[in-house]
From Swiss-Prot:
It comes from Pseudomonas aeruginosa. GO terms for molecular function: adenylate cyclase activity; metal ion binding; nucleotide binding. GO terms for cellular component: cytoplasm. This is Uridylate cyclase. The gene is pycC. InterPro entries: A/G_cyclase (IPR001054), Nucleotide_cyclase (IPR029787). Pycsar (pyrimidine cyclase system for antiphage resistance) provides immunity against bacteriophage. The pyrimidine cyclase (PycC) synthesizes cyclic nucleotides in response to infection; these serve as specific second messenger signals. The signals activate the adjacent effector, leading to bacterial cell death and abortive phage infection. A clade A Pycsar system. It is found in: Cytoplasm.
Length: 514
């Protein structure tokens, strides 16, 4: 049987998820509340400072050799592992929370001092700035010349304000996920430019008495401004102490050699939580990012009213997108990053990847994700749930990808790295909420039908499941022809894409305007 999306199957799952979040509780986060294992039906308004640290030379590590081979990936994973361990040690010392470590980006949160203390926001921002400089100083010392691991080049973004905390996992792996302006703006500041340094939004600048900037992304804090924050924060740790403890920890808990094996498709059977450096996966596969476009503004608009609808919308859409990836197309979700899903897919055998088929199926997967997204919006609105003006931006690419977990035993984080991972995210970021984009490597490996669908721009609009399957099948794509043949054999009521009106649930134009 080929992989397929089915309207009735999707509708049934969406309706069940809507029923699961009928009752929602919104709480204000206060002293001593736990953010661990937040129930699906609960969300917290959290007033805090969000910091994103972007390791800017990850891409250089992945391109250190002409061919993206195993040694390139081993060296890159060791690079990330060493720096992750150092940053985690810093956050523990300064009483900040690690939210996520996604490839080159580390997201952390400062909630202390609480708002019951005078000048709490100012003190939180000062503490975040002092910590940011500590991270920069430590990561300048945590390379390894013997292993050809360079020091990390870091750019840091900081914002302050209210965010919405919900759960970010399944089963026993629930961690808080933070939605809204502060996390989003901090992330954009960290990744918005090639210049290193510490960058604050105007909200964060005002909190510590600095003048607003017309271009915050180009206004790095000066040494004097950083020193003022360090003096005010009075962190009880120095970079020399962190580096010394980090080196001792590496001796006691060495990273070990990375060993790769292939994951026999389907990738949904990959147990990421069992992976270690000695048991890592690596093969040619498709990396895909699907981002709910407009969600940050939607959260900001509803942070104080109809917040329960935000929680319902997120959980329903996110759950359905994951179902499409894992159940309909037998792929593997790596993680949720805010309102974005990161996934992997692969077709082939235990020994080889069928690259052309993998790209064809990824194209139809992208279409299925949009069909489920549109259907979820439709069903949510039918229940009177306010969903704002949301879209879905999708990007994917093909290439060698290594999947493992970083960190010491008992404190590991998932990681999927490869040039295609970076490129697929770039392609997604270049899309509006109605667009799907394909990377150059995937395009080159694709069938002629897929290339015709995306065109020279390698981007297309309003691509849903029916359109993707019909267009590819009509143009001779073998995977799509098989899927259509099986669908027609199972039902005489299949609606051809050219016979139905596409009604996207985003008012965005292709160029991103409204």
């Amino acid at each position: 049987m080929s992989k397929s999306w089915n309207h009735d199957r999707a509708a049934k799952h969406i309706d069940q998820k809507i029923a699961d979040v009928e009752e929602i509780t919104i709480k204000d986060y206060v002293r001593d509340m736990s953010l661990e294992s937040i129930p699906t039906s609960t969300a917290y308004r959290v007033d805090g400072v969000h910091m994103y640290a972007d390791i800017m030379n990850l891409e250089d590590m992945l391109n250190i050799t002409a061919v993206e081979g195993t040694e390139c990936h081993k060296r890159t994973l060791r690079f990330l592992d060493q720096h992750y361990r150092a940053v985690k040690r810093i956050l523990n010392k300064v009483d900040a929370r690690r939210v996520d470590f996604h490839s080159q980006r580390l997201h952390s949160l400062f909630t202390k001092p609480y708002n019951t203390e005078s000048g709490a926001e100012t003190k939180r921002v000062q503490r975040a700035v002092a910590t940011a400089q500590l991270i920069i100083d430590v990561l300048a010392e945590t390379g390894d010349d013997d292993e050809q691991i360079p020091a990390a080049k870091v750019r840091i973004g900081i914002d302050t304000g209210l965010a919405l905390a919900v759960n970010n996992g399944r089963s026993g792996y629930r961690e808080p996920l933070f939605l809204g302006d502060p996390a989003n703006h901090a992330a954009k500041l960290a990744s918005n430019n090639k210049a290193r340094g510490i960058y604050l939004t105007n909200n964060a600048r005002k909190a510590i008495g600095l003048a607003e900037s017309d271009e915050p992304e180009k206004s790095a804090l000066t040494a004097i401004e950083i020193k003022a924050c360090q003096d005010a924060a009075k962190l009880d740790v120095t970079s020399d102490e962190i580096v010394e403890e980090w080196r001792e920890d590496l001796k006691k808990n060495p990273i070990g050699g990375y060993q790769f094996s292939r994951q026999t498709p389907p990738l949904r059977d990959m147990d990421i939580y069992s992976l270690t450096p000695a048991n890592s996966k690596r093969q040619e596969m498709v990396s895909l990012y699907a981002d709910i476009d407009g969600f940050t503004a939607y959260v900001a608009d509803h942070i104080n009213e109809k917040t329960d609808d935000v929680v319902r919308t997120l959980h329903v859409i996110r759950s359905e997108l994951e179902r499409v990836v894992t159940s309909d197309f037998e792929g593997r979700r790596v993680r949720f990053i805010g309102d974005c899903v990161q996934a992997l897919s692969c077709d082939g055998t235990a020994h080889t990847t069928d690259e052309e088929k993998s790209v064809s199926e990824a194209t139809r997967l992208a279409g299925a994700l949009r069909s489920s997204f549109n259907l979820a919006i439709e069903r949510l609105n039918a229940e009177g749930i306010e969903t704002g003006d949301l879209g879905l931006a999708i990007g994917f690419d093909l290439g060698p990808i290594a999947v493992t977990r970083l960190g010491a035993k008992g404190n590991r984080v998932r990681c999927a790295i490869g040039r295609s991972v970076i490129e697929s995210e770039k392609r997604q970021c270049a899309c509006s909420g109605v667009e799907t984009a394909i990377g150059q490597v995937a395009y080159d490996a694709a069938s002629k039908a897929v290339q015709n669908l995306f065109g020279k721009s390698r981007k297309t609009s309003h691509l849903d499941y029916n359109e993707a399957t019909e267009a590819l099948a009509d143009d001779g794509d073998a995977s799509a022809k098989q899927a259509r043949s099986e669908a027609y054999a199972g039902s005489a009521a299949i609606i051809r894409a050219d016979e139905r009106q596409v009604q996207p649930h985003s008012r965005q134009k292709v160029d991103g305007s409204r």
